[in-house]
């Protein structure tokens, strides 16, 4: 598949186009231009390194939304074996913006749950662009409870603009569904490892991300609102999205510094979409490391750690306060 370049990547796109043109010429020419192709390839790689070393939060947000970025099912194919998808919330419907099911991770049985956006127009409409309705979150809750019953670790993959804000979703109890998930995750007797792989949009992301370990891919985002939404509220125009992205502190490094996530998983040069298999291999290693730390941990200790972790959010200490 031909790589789609973002606006700030246009200098890279121009170099890659020249390289592709030279490769096409070399196929039909007796002249050896392989050295020139290698020189340009090296230049392109260095340019990519330079651009990606100085990304703004708004540019990171664009990478997190890249149309070729790997989604949950891409990672399921690369990381897990024997995946068996489970459907429906047993209450209303089967929301396809949430996928989940039983699988094996390094031979160990587990439960996998994640958002799924869709690749083309038809699939995006079918999956509601990765924005779950209440039945999606209730499906996730059902699968978590099933995993809890059989003592299976849970892996969740977060990639959503947010919970669907439509009237029908509100009528069926969107906020209740999200809140109930938070309650269930807090009391699980099995470890839950959450990974933000793309967009982590507000409560729609949090509804499957109350983890014992929360990690983010290097160019993923996690925030209470989208930059455009924030800009529209504060500045009355979405054109201020770059400033809003800066103010929201939505990048992995900013959130790690604040203690809101535990780990950052590095991405291949140019983002996860440039090397899906390489990205999956790095993520698999990180998931294995995270899961190992719960070996031999009792249910009581697991829940106590989680309780302390949740209570630590939002704590602060005043220094230098005047008497």
From Swiss-Prot:
Traced from the root, the source organism's taxonomic lineage reads:
Bacteria, Pseudomonadati, Pseudomonadota, Betaproteobacteria, Burkholderiales
Biological process, per Gene Ontology? fatty acid biosynthetic process; malonyl-CoA biosynthetic process
A single GO CC term for this protein reads: acetyl-CoA carboxylase complex
Tell me where it resides. Cytoplasm
* Keywords, ordered alphabetically: ATP-binding, Cytoplasm, Fatty acid biosynthesis, Fatty acid metabolism, Lipid biosynthesis, Lipid metabolism, Nucleotide-binding, Transferase
Q: What is this protein called?
A: Acetyl-coenzyme A carboxylase carboxyl transferase subunit alpha
Q: Please give the SUPFAM superfamilies that the UniProt record associates with this protein.
A: ClpP/crotonase
Q: Main subcellular localization, coarse class?
A: cytoplasm
Job description of the protein = Component of the acetyl coenzyme A carboxylase (ACC) complex. First, biotin carboxylase catalyzes the carboxylation of biotin on its carrier protein (BCCP) and then the CO(2) group is transferred by the carboxyltransferase to acetyl-CoA to form malonyl-CoA.
Any idea of its EC number?
2.1.3.15
Instruction: Please give the positions of the paired cysteines in each disulfide bond.
Output: none
The protein's assembly and partners: Acetyl-CoA carboxylase is a heterohexamer composed of biotin carboxyl carrier protein (AccB), biotin carboxylase (AccC) and two subunits each of ACCase subunit alpha (AccA) and ACCase subunit beta (AccD).
